[in-house]
A protein has these predicted regions:
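Minor-groove-contacting beta-hairpin "wing" of winged helix-turn-helix DNA-binding domains
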Residues: 1-7
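Bulky hydrophobic/aromatic content
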Residues: 12-104
Length: 262
C-alpha cells in the first residue's frame, strides 16, 4: 500500500480534525486485528496522518495516553494465530467467498481436519477471535477459534448463508457462552438469585437482562430475577460470587454451579 512521505510538510497533507485523528488512532490500537489486510493497507496512510496531525496538539495527543481498555476477567496472553490463515479468513469474509482450511480440534490430541467453510462473521471474546460460519457438509452455525486454523485458502465459490442468520441474534442467543450440554441447544431460563443487600447492589447498576427485577425479601435479603441463556459462561460467572449467593434457582443451574450430578 501507499503512504504519505515521511518528510512531507503537514500543511501539504489532507486536513484531519482532532476528533477524527483520535478516532483513527483508537481504531488502530483496538480494532486493527479485526480488519482484513486489504483494508488495513488502505487505512495505513490515514493512521499515519492521524499520528502526524496529533503531533502538534499536545492536549489531544495526551488523550490516547489516558484511555485504556482492561478485561473484566483474569487477563491472559492471546494465543498465536497463523497469519496467512487469518488473512485468508478475513478476505473470504470480506469477499463473501468460501474458505478451504485445515483446523486443529481442541484437546491434547489436536486432531487436524479439512473443512470447506461459509464465513458469516467474526467475534472477539476476551483474548480469542472466533469465526462464525457453517460447514459445507452441515447447515448449523458453528464457531471456530482463529488460533486453531493451521491453514486457509479463499475459494472462488460464493459463500452460502443461512436464510435467517443475524449475527446479533446469534450472540444474544447465548451461542458464544457455550452450551452446558453439547447434546442440546442453548435454552433461556428464568434465573433467580438471593443475595444480601450490599451484594445485590451490583445488579442495580449492571443488569443481567432488560427484564431483570430486584426485589427486597426482607431487611437483609434481595432476590434478583432475569431471563438469560443457560450457558457454561453463566455457570463460571456465578461461581465467581462464591458464598455471596445465598440461593440459586432453578435447580439445574444450582447443580451446574456446584458440580452436582443431576
Amino acid at each position: 500500500g501507499w503512504r504519505w512521505r515521511s518528510d512531507a510538510p503537514i500543511q501539504s497533507l489532507p486536513h484531519m480534525t482532532s476528533s477524527q485523528a483520535v478516532t483513527f488512532m483508537m481504531v488502530e490500537e483496538h480494532l486493527k486485528h479485526l480488519l482484513p489486510p486489504s483494508l488495513i493497507s488502505e487505512m495505513n496512510p490515514w493512521f499515519d496522518l492521524a499520528k502526524r496531525s496529533l503531533s502538534t496538539q499536545n492536549n489531544v495527543r495526551q488523550w490516547i495516553n489516558r484511555v485504556r481498555i482492561v478485561p473484566a476477567t483474569q487477563p491472559v496472553i492471546p494465543p498465536l494465530v497463523e497469519r496467512q490463515a487469518q488473512q485468508s479468513i478475513y478476505e473470504g469474509l470480506l469477499q463473501d467467498k468460501q474458505i478451504e482450511c485445515i483446523y486443529r480440534s481442541r484437546g491434547h490430541l489436536g486432531e487436524e481436519k479439512s473443512y470447506i467453510l461459509n464465513p458469516l462473521g467474526l467475534v472477539q471474546k476476551g483474548a480469542i477471535i472466533y469465526l462464525i460460519c457453517t460447514r459445507l457438509d452441515k447447515s448449523d452455525v458453528q464457531t471456530f477459534a482463529l488460533h486453531r486454523f493451521k491453514s486457509a485458502t479463499v475459494l472462488d465459490t460464493r459463500a452460502m448463508h443461512p436464510v435467517d442468520f443475524d449475527i446479533d441474534s446469534y450472540i444474544d442467543s447465548g451461542a458464544l457462552g457455550f452450551r452446558v450440554d453439547f447434546s442440546k441447544p442453548t435454552e433461556n431460563i428464568e434465573l433467580k438469585l438471593i443475595m444480601h443487600e450490599d451484594d445485590a447492589q451490583y445488579f442495580t447498576e449492571s443488569q443481567l437482562s432488560k427484564n431483570q427485577k430486584v426485589e427486597a425479601l426482607n431487611d437483609q435479603l434481595y432476590q434478583i430475577s432475569a431471563v438469560v441463556p443457560f450457558t457454561s459462561q453463566l455457570v463460571w460467572w456465578l461461581r465467581s460470587f462464591g458464598k455471596k449467593l445465598v440461593r440459586i434457582e432453578p435447580v439445574e443451574v444450582f447443580n451446574a454451579v456446584h458440580e452436582i450430578e443431576s
